[in-house]
């Protein structure tokens, strides 16, 4: 048997386990590069989303080291990550035999339904013949095997690379298409366990046929039938959808395209959800019964929302700028709350976006607020923590909506400011459908029902006095600044200063 390395631990797939541990791990600051969906961590995410799938890293042991922690979900762990362990010998003579034996060993030890072979730089450079190895090993093992490399001119991101391989090597040609078939496609990295139930129910209510939900604990048999649907609904634009369209004639719809067009069309709002469902009804040719069902659901939600709006309307909030609006903008539009202070932190945006793009996004948010309330908000650009708190006090703010870039929640509470933890709400309640705004209304009302707690354990820490990371202690803020400076260093500018 090949010498494969693994932790020997089982996997946990209980969504209820995550709630507390997510809150504990989510604030951990990560070096930006660890969050890039590179070849290995991205492919591991895909493996995590397929039931009884074991990823096999065809790599030197060094490449497989420290891949137990998922950088996108630090509360999650890849327990089973066997590695073929190629050495200098294979880099000279080729690693085909090593890969063949490793696949057999994994199939014998884990009894998986699918082995996902993940290649790395070394076998890619020496040109290991994955296709012929897998063709031969399939004759000797009872499970399916697919492989992913970066050689096929695919988008060089692990998630897209692996999903493209799944579509190319695992999905069957459909014997027949479902007339109104649709796939809901997402990943465990997007907390999908918490957000797809309502979307599925809404689609069925308007007459769509749910072919499958991918890729969250999907079985191999379910994945084989993916091509029976006419439409793939995805979180974001996905490279693999192009292959599915060319190979199986499937259309695709990226949910985030509604957010980019207009804050009013965000799927988190009532009108945005209605427009999304109407768009899907047109794509699937569901006819008038679908539009009637959408209108009935809209009236039902608006009636339920009216009770909460009566309680919250007119409350003044302070909110931080969010790229696609966030909870604060929905409070303004759907709950009738008034934004008195808008806090905009530009450094994080300016690092990765052009100045013109940043200014356009800010303009959109300000225009959105002005359309939905009578008064203009006080706009603060990169305020110091003390200035931020002072503005909230001076403008009679009832609730501070705190995102990641806000002053630490404990700092607000310590000054007697009532807070809404937008980060925690988003982690647990983000979803596509009407429940998002209803849950938001309930959570905001619950905050007003509780007294403001001035003294918390976290308020005893000394937080950074800088403008960029007031939510971190001075120690962690300095480390984060070091990583950010290294990551965003502009080579051209450095070269221009003396050519070094």
Over which residues does each language-model region extend?
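An N-terminal assembly and electron-transfer interface module characteristic of large anaerobic redox
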Residues: 1-500
